[in-house]
């Protein structure tokens, strides 16, 4: 099966790509989409890559063409409607999370959505998780939260229960070998 170009860097994750492409298609048709997604998987599975590809596909007029300005901006980490968040130190503090929640509530600049890609969401302190929960419970209508963590159990149940779960697996060796061969490595 051929997938949108935005998902091209996801090796061995066809089930996940199918799930995300269906969500992008539903959003493009006006059916809307879940406001919070939790991408889980062990290190090297591509959870942050999947979340970034999903953001690109949601913001692309062609559902993830990989060629337009929007797709390039997301790939470069410079799209004004995508807030890419990493912890300042070992964990996310409540101040950083509250600032993020305020930014997330602003209207998108170029696209239909304001997307918050929250890498290592499992590293939020308890107070930060509570601030995040409030934003996820009462989302802005044009904000989509993409949380990344190794395991769903790494986040509080109250947050997990409000997210659509996307579970990535470690890619099979043969899939990785095919990708490396295709890349000329």
Task: Name each model feature, range by range.
Residues 105, 130-147:
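Conserved catalytic/switch belt of AAA+ P-loop NTPases
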Residues 156-185:
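Conserved AAA+ ATPase core "coupling" helix
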Residues 1-120, 127, 144:
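P-loop/Walker A NTP-binding region and its immediately flanking N-terminal helices
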Residues 84-86, 147, 165-167:
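Structural signal for conserved beta-strand scaffold positions within catalytic alpha/beta enzyme cores
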Residues 119-120, 147-152, 170-172:
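A short beta-strand-to-loop transition that corresponds to the Sensor-1 phosphate-sensing loop
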Residues 124, 139-156:
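Sensor-1/coupling segment of RecA-like P-loop NTPase cores
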């Amino acid at each position: 099966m051929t997938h949108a170009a935005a998902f091209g860097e996801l090796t061995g994750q066809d089930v996940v790509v199918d799930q995300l492409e269906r969500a992008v298609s539903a959003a493009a048709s006006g059916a809307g989409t879940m406001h919070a997604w939790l991408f889980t998987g062990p290190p090297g599975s591509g959870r942050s890559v999947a979340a970034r590809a999903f953001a690109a596909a949601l913001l692309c007029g062609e559902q993830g063409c990989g060629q337009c300005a929007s797709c390039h901006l997301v790939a470069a980490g410079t799209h004004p409607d995508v807030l890419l968040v990493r912890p300042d130190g070992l964990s996310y503090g409540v101040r950083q999370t509250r600032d993020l929640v305020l930014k997330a509530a602003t209207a998108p600049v170029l696209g239909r959505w304001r997307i918050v890609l929250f890498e290592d969401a499992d590293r939020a302190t308890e107070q930060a998780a509570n601030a995040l929960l409030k934003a996820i419970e009462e989302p802005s209508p044009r904000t989509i939260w993409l949380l990344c963590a190794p395991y769903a159990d790494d986040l509080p149940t109250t947050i997990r229960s409000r997210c659509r779960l996307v579970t990535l697996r470690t890619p099979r060796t043969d899939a990785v070998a095919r990708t490396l061969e295709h890349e000329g490595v």
